[in-house]
Amino acid sequence: MPREIITLQLGQCGNQIGFEFWKQLCAEHGISPEGIVEEFATEGTDRKDVFFYQADDEHYIPRAVLLDLEPRVIHSILNSPYAKLYNPENIYLSEHGGGAGNNWASGFSQGEKIHEDIFDIIDREADGSDSLEGFVLCHSIAGGTGSGLGSYLLERLNDRYPKKLVQTYSVFPNQDEMSDVVVQPYNSLLTLKRLTQNADCVVVLDNTALNRIATDRLHIQNPSFSQINQLVSTIMSASTTTLRYPGYMNNDLIGLIASLIPTPRLHFLMTGYTPLTTDQSVASVRKTTVLDVMRRLLQPKNVMVSTGRDRQTNHCYIAILNIIQGEVDPTQVHKSLQRIRERKLANFIPWGPASIQVALSRKSPYLPSAHRVSGLMMANHTSISSLFERTCRQYDKLRKREAFLEQFRKEDIFKENFDELDTSREIVQQLIDEYHAATRPDYISWGTQEQ
């Protein structure tokens, strides 16, 4: 019984990474850009219907909703070879097409105006599923549409579908270069409040780290957006392989999430992937064994979140799930886990078991791969809080000077006062505090003393 997942793509970033994700899924399942199953795709052991459904003429259509407040990216998708893949009724562009101007408040208040049209699309998709498991939201947190409209939709999804899971792939801004969005810290903080309160699981895609990996590991001098987005689509497709090539465990979203998130608020995950290769570097193929892959996944340089060195806090893993793709002998997995535990390659929380789970998954039979084994690590690690601390520091600088707030004042939510900003700041601070508390043995009783 497949549990379907509806993908919501928001704004420029969300639609670009979503586009790469669907390209990747089509390649893995042997589906042509028009949605027709290729003649060579005869192995019927994959589950296409988690992410696709079939039209009357047998071609596959993604369960995706494409939303944007300005037309550029969606038009480029509609002019690509994949234009016929999507259901045109599932594409929503706002009528005036002016975008949200990288302003969270603008994206949020436009969400209030257009949410009925958007939910007509989402409800229709949900009604077309046999047993909908949840939603996956792709967006960035720094701009206007992905952050503002994304925040609004997260709140509404919780009201409308309280029992469905909401997982997000959230792109965090690149800290190494100057941003062209001056209000980025405001946008990020306001979105983080919703990600904390309204999502069940947030996969953090940190542009700072993705750029670093592209330059250091893939040796690309100035990585373009499309190269970074390919990295992202690799993560997204690898994190859903167990849903699409079902094994005996982790073959639905709740199974993936349950093993990684023991306490509800600490649901921000980081990812690592190995071995990374681009088309040019196939020459550097090594022999990959399960132990190699699992050991490399624990190396900080393969982790796609740039967390600073925090000497005061003893950061540790809350839980790890490694999704290993390829030809793997299960006894090897057991040995590798023992080796990792013996050598203490990973530092775990003091208040619970050292949870490293391994899900084995097949590779797509239709994609040539240079490696026998590749792996994706999804980890819940307390050092993710340093990302939120960085956002808070930047926010505090701007807020102290009340910089750029007049852009927000124009919208209803900030007409009277800026309480929404201040409560968001408090909620993100509580999240940071809880991550710090999770590094200590007394975390189990944390939050009970204060009341």
Swiss-Prot record:
Quaternary data: Component of the gamma-tubulin ring complex (gTuRC) consisting of TUBGCP2, TUBGCP3, TUBGCP4, TUBGCP5 and TUBGCP6 and gamma-tubulin TUBG1 or TUBG2. TUBGCP2, TUBGCP3, TUBGCP4, TUBGCP5 and TUBGCP6 assemble in a 5:5:2:1:1 stoichiometry; each is associated with a gamma-tubulin, thereby arranging 14 gamma-tubulins in a helical manner. Gamma-tubulin at the first position is blocked by TUBGCP3 at the last position, allowing 13 protafilaments to grow into a microtubule.
Keyword annotations of the record: Cytoplasm, Cytoskeleton, GTP-binding, Microtubule, Nucleotide-binding, Phosphoprotein
Single GO MF annotation: microtubule nucleator activity
Main localization of the protein described in the UniProt heading: cytoplasm
Record organism: Bos taurus (Bovine)
PANTHER family, sorted: TUBULIN (PTHR11588)
Protein localization: Cytoplasm, Cytoskeleton, Microtubule organizing center, Centrosome; Cytoplasm, Cytoskeleton, Spindle
SMART domains: Tubulin, Tubulin_C
Residues bound to GTP: A142, G143, G144, T145, G146, S147, G148
Pfam family name, one: Tubulin
One example of a Gene Ontology biological process annotation: mitotic sister chromatid segregation
Family statement drawn from the similarity comment of this UniProt entry: Belongs to the tubulin family.
Post-translational modification: Phosphorylation at Ser-131 by BRSK1 regulates centrosome duplication, possibly by mediating relocation of gamma-tubulin and its associated proteins from the cytoplasm to the centrosome.
This protein's name: Tubulin gamma-1 chain
Gene Ontology cellular component terms for the protein in this record: centrosome; cytoplasm; gamma-tubulin ring complex; mitotic spindle microtubule; nucleus; polar microtubule; spindle
Modified residues (Phosphoserine): S131
Function: Tubulin is the major constituent of microtubules, protein filaments consisting of alpha- and beta-tubulin heterodimers. Gamma-tubulin is a key component of the gamma-tubulin ring complex (gTuRC) which mediates microtubule nucleation. The gTuRC regulates the minus-end nucleation of alpha-beta tubulin heterodimers that grow into microtubule protafilaments, a critical step in centrosome duplication and spindle formation.
Source organism superkingdom: Eukaryota
